[in-house]
Curated annotation (Swiss-Prot):
It comes from Oryctolagus cuniculus. The gene is FGA. This is Fibrinogen alpha chain. It is found in: Secreted. GO terms for biological process: adaptive immune response; blood coagulation; innate immune response. Cleaved by the protease thrombin to yield monomers which, together with fibrinogen beta (FGB) and fibrinogen gamma (FGG), polymerize to form an insoluble fibrin matrix. Fibrin has a major function in hemostasis as one of the primary components of blood clots. In addition, functions during the early stages of wound repair to stabilize the lesion and guide cell migration during re-epithelialization. Was originally thought to be essential for platelet aggregation, based on in vitro studies using anticoagulated blood.
Length: 16
């Protein structure tokens, strides 16, 4: 899982 994916899982798209 790359940083964008973990933020996506965690915050619902903020890291995408």
């Amino acid at each position: 899982v790359d940083p964008g994916e973990s933020t996506f899982i965690d915050e619902g798209a903020t890291g995408r």
